[in-house]
Curated annotation (Swiss-Prot):
<feature type="propeptide">
    <location>
        <begin position="22"/>
        <end position="91"/>
    </location>
</feature>
<dbReference type="GO" id="GO:0097009">
    <property type="term" value="P:energy homeostasis"/>
</dbReference>
<dbReference type="GO" id="GO:0005576">
    <property type="term" value="C:extracellular region"/>
</dbReference>
<dbReference type="GO" id="GO:0042593">
    <property type="term" value="P:glucose homeostasis"/>
</dbReference>
<feature type="disulfide bond">
    <location>
        <begin position="95"/>
        <end position="103"/>
    </location>
</feature>
<comment type="similarity">
    <text>Belongs to the guanylin family.</text>
</comment>
<dbReference type="GO" id="GO:0030250">
    <property type="term" value="F:guanylate cyclase activator activity"/>
</dbReference>
<dbReference type="GO" id="GO:0009749">
    <property type="term" value="P:response to glucose"/>
</dbReference>
<dbReference type="Pfam" id="PF02058">
    <property type="entry name" value="Guanylin"/>
</dbReference>
<keyword id="KW-0732">Signal</keyword>
<feature type="signal peptide">
    <location>
        <begin position="1"/>
        <end position="21"/>
    </location>
</feature>
<dbReference type="GO" id="GO:0045776">
    <property type="term" value="P:negative regulation of blood pressure"/>
</dbReference>
<dbReference type="GO" id="GO:0035264">
    <property type="term" value="P:multicellular organism growth"/>
</dbReference>
<dbReference type="GO" id="GO:0019934">
    <property type="term" value="P:cGMP-mediated signaling"/>
</dbReference>
<dbReference type="GO" id="GO:0070294">
    <property type="term" value="P:renal sodium ion absorption"/>
</dbReference>
<comment type="function">
    <text>Endogenous activator of intestinal guanylate cyclase. It stimulates this enzyme through the same receptor binding region as the heat-stable enterotoxins. May be a potent physiological regulator of intestinal fluid and electrolyte transport. May be an autocrine/paracrine regulator of intestinal salt and water transport.</text>
</comment>
<feature type="disulfide bond">
    <location>
        <begin position="62"/>
        <end position="75"/>
    </location>
</feature>
Length: 106
């Protein structure tokens, strides 16, 4: 294999890896990291706009049509609020996502 073929193979692997995205698994739910980031944005907007806040059993974000599809099944859970909180915590912890090679268990 020549040097240019090796570089092409490495580049292809990097592109494929980044295209797959990062997934978070928690209590039977599997969601994309990008979806959790979108969840944070939606919740921040709802906190700043009292008209978007609902009083119900579900977290307010469950009523938002912009909620990513992979997060919508969480709203059917009785523990939706605590699940969203856990997902946000995991998404901000580099060791949970195995981004930092110094973390153990990755």
């Amino acid at each position: 294999m020549s040097g240019s073929q090796l570089w092409a193979a490495v580049l292809l692997l990097l592109v494929l890896q980044s295209a797959q995205g990062v997934y978070i698994k928690y209590h039977g739910f599997q969601v994309q990291l990008e979806s959790v980031k979108k969840l944070n944005e939606l919740e921040e907007k709802q906190m700043s706009d009292p008209q978007q806040q609902k009083s119900g059993l579900l977290p307010d974000v469950c009523y938002n049509p912009a909620l990513p599809l992979d997060l919508q099944p969480v709203c059917a859970s009785q523990e939706a609020a605590s699940t969203f909180k856990a997902l946000r915590t995991i998404a901000t912890d580099e060791c949970e996502l195995c981004i930092n090679v110094a973390c153990t268990g990755c």
